[in-house]
Regions:
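Structured C-terminal portions of repeat-based eukaryotic scaffold domains
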Residues: 142-203
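The feature captures the LRR N-terminal capping module
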Residues: 1-85, 94-150, 191, 195-200, ...
Length: 271
């Protein structure tokens, strides 16, 4: 196994120092570090890399997120396909915009309080014990309520997404290969997520429910793509007209029934 150290970065970086440049000056200059698929199992103190903005550490053996407190300029962090079981030590990354944590061992989405600039969170395909599902800490969801725009929670045995209603600026939700079952729950979610324009729920049990697609299109005016298929204006208008006609018939039937009851009541009185 390999530890990510300053020496390793200095040796392997694509950015080569000038002759007159000291190691310290060189490390301060680095903005991108890519050590994906290098058998990295731990992150050492990299605090000299003051200007680091993008860190690629996917496809490694990292079990704990450590020594990133210094990286206050970090905007993109790629940690997918490691051995991480807990989201921690990220509170100081105030500029972080994109966080990739798919393919780890994370059971609870937590520890993201204070990351008010986070726009994308990718936590798909966690390697959970059989029968367990990915959970969301309400404090983390509350912290991300205004910033998060893209969320990928695919393949995590999730059967309820109502907790996500708080994410008011979410515009893309990818939740394929889960256990979502109830159309009503999705209707409630879409009623809250007024900016959502793309939702992918392929290979969930709910997709097999009657009128599943029609009901979701009717409840959301912002949705443009559902399960990878574009929602055409003609399709939405047809469904709206159909619903209006159906509602009108219901009202008419109710009114006729009420009038009939009144008529029968008058007839009984006259008798």
């Amino acid at each position: 196994m390999v530890r990510l150290t300053l020496d390793l970065i200095a040796k392997k970086s694509n950015l080569k120092p000038r002759k007159e440049e000291t190691t310290l000056q060189y490390l301060k200059k680095i903005t991108h570090i890519n050590f994906s698929a290098k058998n990295i199992d731990a992150i050492e103190d990299l605090s000299l890399c003051k200007n680091l903005s993008v860190l690629y550490l996917y496809d490694n053996c990292i079990s704990q997120i450590t020594n990133l407190n210094y990286a206050t300029n970090l905007t993109h962090l790629y940690l997918q396909n490691n051995c991480i079981s807990c989201i921690e030590n990220l509170g100081s990354l105030k500029k972080l915009e994109k966080l990739y944590l798919g393919g780890n061992y994370i059971a609870v989405i937590e520890g993201l309080e204070g990351l008010e600039g986070l726009r994308e969170l990718h936590v798909e395909s966690q390697r959970l014990p059989l029968g367990e599902k990915l959970l969301f800490d309400p404090r983390t969801l509350h912290s991300l309520a205004k910033s998060l725009s893209i969320l990928n929670i695919s393949n995590n045995n999730i059967d309820d997404v109502r907790d996500l209603e708080i994410l008011e600026n979410l515009n893309q939700l990818i939740a394929v290969d889960n256990q979502l079952l109830h159309v009503k729950d999705l209707e409630c979610l879409l009623n809250k997520l007024m900016k959502l324009w793309k939702m992918d729920l392929n290979r969930n049990p709910v997709c097999l429910k009657p009128k599943y697609r029609d009901r979701l299109i009717l409840v959301s005016k912002s949705l443009e793509f559902l399960d990878g298929k574009e929602i055409k204006n003609m399709e939405r208008q047809f469904l709206m007209n159909w619903k209006a006609s159906k509602d009108a018939k219901k009202i008419s039937k109710k009114r006729n029934s009420k009038n009939e009851d009144i008529s029968n009541s008058h007839r009984r009185i006259s008798l």
